[in-house]
């Protein structure tokens, strides 16, 4: 859906053929209907949480990141982190391939803005590369988990008081 929608956004931002835009809108509408049917099926199982629709994730990014940002996963990466925070998941691991500068810009660059919107968000960016030492990756995740535990303990103390 992201790639189809990117074509529509490109035409809005830079111009393009109206027929191409209409075809993309039809495809996006079709994918949206499929996504809604998946979500309807998932809703009946208590073991799963229904994911937000593509349209909702796109709406979350409005004013945070531009739709023309397509570096790495572009605005979608930011939208997914915002959706997780909105759903109550405060501890988020943003994994990205090592050396992918576009993902660093899209991922790490938006972490502060996400924390401004949702102060409880505890986000860590972890780079994965076949040659990178696992210790660094594991330590970053452990640090995020320890901060998460501290936040949980502080919340529990507030409830008890």
Predicted feature descriptions by range:
Residues 1-161:
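An N-terminal assembly and electron-transfer interface module characteristic of large anaerobic redox
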């Amino acid at each position: 859906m992201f790639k189809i929608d990117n074509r529509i956004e490109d035409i809005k931002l830079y111009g393009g053929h109206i027929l191409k835009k209409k075809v993309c809108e039809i495809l996006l509408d079709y994918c949206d209907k499929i996504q809604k049917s998946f979500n309807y099926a998932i809703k009946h199982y208590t073991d799963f949480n229904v994911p937000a629709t593509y349209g909702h994730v796109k709406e979350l990014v409005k004013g945070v990141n531009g739709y023309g940002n397509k570096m790495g996963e572009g605005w979608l990466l930011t939208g997914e982190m915002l959706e997780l925070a909105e759903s109550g998941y405060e501890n988020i691991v943003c994994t990205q391939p090592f050396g992918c500068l576009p993902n660093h810009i899209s991922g790490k660059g938006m972490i502060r803005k996400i924390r401004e919107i949702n102060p409880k968000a505890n986000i860590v960016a972890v780079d994965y590369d076949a040659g990178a030492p696992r210790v660094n990756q594991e330590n970053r995740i452990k640090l995020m988990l320890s901060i998460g535990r501290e936040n949980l303990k502080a919340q529990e103390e507030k409830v008890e008081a």
